[in-house]
């Protein structure tokens, strides 16, 4: 078990928490980052690219000139791809770029990402963070005290006030624990977890 300090919002130590080595202090596998992030970015692609082929371009139903005895190359339609205004040959079509990554791989990559932030000393665990109202300036001061600018803040459940406070900061964002993913961890410079969130992640990733 690995021990981590738990802080209040003024960066004063208020206790310690023990978390599984396998989740927060394991081996970092960068290839898993590559696989999971590539899949995430692929699934984000809209895939709506499209062009008109000769069957979709209007007109061109009539043969432009007779087949023989004109001295010109034979043509069947003015909408063939070699004509100006014709359809595109073998152009892009709408497609779905997303593909599945095995659940075990996703979990292993998430464990690696947590271990990486822990090794870099960019993982901060706070006792709790439940603002009464959304206030960006207050969130900015807390992150500055925690030494976690451009941070991803994760709470055990949806926290509307905290989400609105943090998301308005340049380079920072908020996620509920169930939405935590490798891409967002790597995208931000630091990771801030509540103690409850850390225990939830330990249970789900062990």
UniProtKB/Swiss-Prot annotation:
> What GO CC annotations are associated with the protein?
ribonucleoprotein complex; ribosome
Q: Which GO terms describe its molecular function?
A: rRNA binding; structural constituent of ribosome
Which UniProt keywords are given for this protein, alphabetically ordered? Answer: Ribonucleoprotein, Ribosomal protein, RNA-binding, rRNA-binding
UniProt xrefs under InterPro entries: Ribosomal_uL4 (IPR002136), Ribosomal_uL4-like (IPR013005), Ribosomal_uL4_dom_sf (IPR023574)
Residue ranges for the region (Disordered) are 48-98
The organism's superkingdom is given as Bacteria
Which SUPFAM superfamilies does this chain map to?
Answer: Ribosomal protein L4
Q: Does the keyword Disulfide bond apply?
A: no
Q: Where is the composition biased (Basic residues)?
A: 63-72
Q: Subunit composition?
A: Part of the 50S ribosomal subunit.
This molecule's function is given as: One of the primary rRNA binding proteins, this protein initially binds near the 5'-end of the 23S rRNA. It is important during the early stages of 50S assembly. It makes multiple contacts with different domains of the 23S rRNA in the assembled 50S subunit and ribosome.
The family annotation for this protein states: Belongs to the universal ribosomal protein uL4 family.
Q: What is the recorded name of this protein?
A: Large ribosomal subunit protein uL4
What's the source species' lineage? Bacteria, Pseudomonadati, Myxococcota, Myxococcia, Myxococcales
Q: Which gene encodes it?
A: rplD
């Amino acid at each position: 078990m690995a021990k981590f300090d738990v802080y209040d919002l003024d960066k004063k130590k208020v206790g310690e928490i023990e978390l599984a080595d396998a989740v927060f202090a394991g081996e970092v596998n960068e290839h898993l980052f590559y696989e999971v992030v590539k899949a995430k970015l692929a699934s984000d692609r809209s895939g709506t690219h499209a062009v008109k082929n000769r069957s979709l371009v209007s007109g061109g139903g009539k043969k432009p000139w007779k087949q023989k005895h004109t001295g010109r190359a034979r043509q069947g339609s003015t909408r063939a791809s070699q004509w100006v205004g014709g359809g595109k040959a073998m152009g892009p079509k709408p497609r779905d770029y997303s593909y599945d990554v095995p659940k075990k791989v996703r979990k292993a990559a998430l464990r690696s990402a947590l271990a990486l932030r822990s090794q870099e000393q960019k993982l901060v665990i706070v006792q709790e963070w439940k603002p009464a109202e959304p206030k960006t300036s207050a969130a900015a001061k807390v992150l500055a005290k925690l030494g976690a600018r451009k941070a991803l803040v994760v709470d055990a459940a949806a926290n509307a006030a905290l989400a609105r406070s943090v998301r308005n900061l340049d380079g920072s964002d908020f996620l509920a624990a169930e939405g935590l993913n490798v891409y967002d961890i790597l995208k931000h410079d630091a990771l801030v977890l509540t103690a409850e969130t850390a225990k939830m992640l330990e249970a789900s990733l062990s």
